[in-house]
From Swiss-Prot:
Belongs to the UPF0181 family. This is UPF0181 protein VPA0916. Transmembrane segments: none annotated. InterPro entries: UPF0181. NCBIfam families: PRK05114.1 (NF003476). The lineage of its organism: Bacteria, Pseudomonadati, Pseudomonadota, Gammaproteobacteria, Vibrionales. Pfam families: UPF0181. Disulfide bonds: none annotated. It comes from Vibrio parahaemolyticus serotype O3:K6 (strain RIMD 2210633).
Length: 52
């Protein structure tokens, strides 16, 4: 599940945790929140790679 995640900094990891916690606070399950944030990270990384 996480093999294709790009490398992210500690700060980015902390931000991801905060986004996951926000989603969970709104009622999203833990697994779904992690999936949503992981998909966002992948999309952001892909966009950066295309822009390079």
């Amino acid at each position: 599940m996480f093999d294709d995640l790009p490398p992210i900094s500690h700060k980015e990891q902390q931000e991801a945790v905060e986004r996951i916690q926000e989603l969970m606070a709104k009622g999203t399950s833990t697994a779904e929140a992690i999936k949503i944030v992981a998909d966002q990270i992948r999309a952001e990384y892909a966009a950066k790679q295309q822009g390079s």
